[in-house]
C-alpha cells in the first residue's frame, strides 16, 4: 500500500479539497447534515473569522496516491488556554477513511504543531470556540444529525481509542416528543416565578429588536457558559458576526427572551429553529446558486417535524429559579402552531446537570452522545 502524505493547506485549491472531503465521505449517509460550504470558507479564512485574533490554526490533508483520505485542523485557542491555565492544542474538523494509519498521521501532525508551540496536551474534536462543531459521535449513529454538530461513522471512536486517546468529557443530546399542551406544572411554575421575580417573557419582534437585544443575548451566553468545559468568551466582533449572519434568518417567534419587568434587563434567552438537516442534504451543503431555496423552504414554508433547541442561556443570578418553565410555557404554543412534533436539544455537557435536567418533566430520550478525547503530548 502506498505511503500516506500529509499536506498543509496553503491555498484555495487545498481549502476546497479540505471542505470537499467531508461531503465526499458522507454523501451516501442518510443521517449526516452536510457542512455548509460557504460557512466553512468563512470559518477557515484568517482574514474573515474573528477567532483568528486569539487562535493559531493550520489545516492538513492526508493523501494516498494523490487522493485525499483524511483531513484535520490544528488549533491553539490562546484565550481559552489562558483562562483555564492549560497548554492544549485542539484538533478539529477531523475526518478520515476507516484506516487507523491515516488518523495516526493526521494526529501526529497536530501533535507536532502543538509541541512546536509549547503545548502539553492534545484534545478534540474541538473548534475555535464552542459555536463550532465539537465532539466525536460515540452513540446514535443511526439518528438524524443536527446542523452545526459533527457526524461521523462508528469507526472513529474505535480508532481514537486505539491511538491512545481517552475521554475528556461527553456531551448528550436529547429528543422530546412535543407536548399537546403546556404541562400543568410548567404553567404553575411559570406564573409563580414571573410574579415572584417580576419577569416578563416574549419573542423578538423585528429588526430593531435584533439590533437592540442581539449583543445582550451574547452577553448572557458568555455569562451563562463561562464555567463550561473549554469555553472562551465571544468577542464583540464575533457576536456581531453571528447577529448579522444568523439571527435575521431565524423566525423571530423562535427567539425568546426573559426580562426584568421594571428595568427591562435581559436575564435569559432561548433560540431555536426548524431542523435544517434534510434541507442541507437536498442542497448538498451549498447555499448557492439554489441551495438557499431548500433552506428557506424548511424555515418558513414546509417546516419539518423537528425543531432544534439550539441554546438556552440564563444569567447566573437567575439560575435554579425555574426560568425554563417560563420559556417553555411561551414556546410550546408557538411550536404547536408551527406543526413541530419533536424537539431536539443541542449537545449539553453531561456534567452540566442544570442544563441536562431542564427537560426532565418532558420525558426526554437521550438519543446521541459525543465525546472530546484527550492525550498528553
Please annotate each region the language model reported.
Residues 1-31:
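Generic start-of-chain signal for non-secretory N-termini
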Residues 3-4, 150-228:
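Acyltransferase donor/substrate-recognition loop-hinge adjacent to the catalytic core
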Residues 21, 25, 109, 113, ...:
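Generic, well-ordered alpha-helical scaffold segments in large soluble proteins
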Residues 22-64, 72-82, 204, 209-312:
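A conserved beta-strand-loop-helix scaffold within acyl/acetyltransferase catalytic domains
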Residues 48, 75-79, 312, 357-360, ...:
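Alpha-helical subdomain
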Residues 75-79, 94-96, 127-129, 179, ...:
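An acidic- and aromatic-residue-enriched active-site/binding cleft used to recognize and process polar
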Residues 83-164, 283-361:
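Acyl-donor binding region in acyl/amide transferases
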Amino acid at each position: 500500500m502506498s505511503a500516506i502524505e500529509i499536506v498543509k493547506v496553503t491555498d484555495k485549491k487545498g481549502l476546497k479539497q479540505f471542505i470537499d472531503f467531508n461531503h465526499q465521505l458522507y454523501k451516501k449517509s442518510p443521517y449526516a447534515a452536510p457542512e455548509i460550504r460557504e460557512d466553512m470558507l468563512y470559518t477557515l479564512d484568517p482574514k474573515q473569522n474573528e477567532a483568528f485574533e486569539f487562535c493559531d490554526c493550520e489545516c492538513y490533508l492526508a493523501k494516498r496516491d494523490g487522493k485525499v483520505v483524511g483531513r484535520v485542523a490544528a488549533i491553539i485557542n490562546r484565550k481559552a488556554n489562558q483562562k483555564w491555565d492549560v497548554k492544549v492544542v485542539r484538533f478539529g474538523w477531523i475526518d478520515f477513511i476507516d484506516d487507523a494509519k491515516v488518523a495516526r498521521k493526521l494526529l501526529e501532525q497536530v501533535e507536532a504543531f502543538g509541541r512546536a508551540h509549547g503545548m502539553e496536551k492534545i484534545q478534540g474534536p474541538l473548534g475555535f470556540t464552542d459555536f463550532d462543531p465539537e465532539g466525536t459521535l460515540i452513540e446514535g449513529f443511526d439518528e438524524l444529525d443536527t446542523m452545526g454538530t459533527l457526524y461521523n461513522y462508528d469507526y472513529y471512536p474505535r480508532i481514537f481509542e486505539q491511538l491512545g486517546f481517552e475521554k475528556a468529557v461527553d456531551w448528550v443530546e436529547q429528543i422530546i416528543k412535543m407536548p399537546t399542551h403546556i404541562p400543568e406544572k410548567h404553567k404553575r411554575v411559570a406564573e409563580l416565578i414571573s410574579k415572584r421575580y417580576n419577569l416578563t417573557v416574549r419573542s423578538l419582534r423585528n429588526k430593531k429588536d435584533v439590533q437592540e437585544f442581539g449583543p445582550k443575548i451574547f452577553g448572557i451566553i458568555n455569562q451563562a457558559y463561562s464555567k463550561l468545559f473549554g469555553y472562551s468568551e465571544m468577542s464583540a466582533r464575533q457576536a456581531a458576526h453571528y447577529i448579522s449572519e444568523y439571527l435575521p434568518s431565524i423566525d423571530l417567534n423562535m427567539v425568546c427572551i426573559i426580562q426584568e419587568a421594571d428595568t427591562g434587563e435581559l436575564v435569559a434567552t432561548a433560540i431555536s429553529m426548524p431542523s435544517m438537516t434534510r434541507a442541507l442534504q437536498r442542497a448538498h451543503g451549498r447555499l448557492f446558486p439554489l441551495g438557499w431555496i431548500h433552506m428557506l423552504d424548511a424555515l418558513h414554508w414546509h417546516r419539518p417535524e423537528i425543531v432544534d433547541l439550539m441554546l438556552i442561556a440564563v444569567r447566573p443570578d437567575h439560575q435554579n429559579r425555574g426560568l425554563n418553565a417560563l420559556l417553555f410555557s411561551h414556546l410550546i404554543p408557538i411550536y404547536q402552531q408551527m406543526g413541530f412534533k419533536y424537539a431536539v436539544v443541542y449537545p449539553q455537557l453531561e456534567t452540566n446537570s442544570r442544563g441536562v435536567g431542564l427537560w426532565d418533566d418532558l420525558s426526554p430520550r437521550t438519543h446521541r452522545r459525543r465525546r472530546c478525547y484527550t492525550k498528553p503530548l
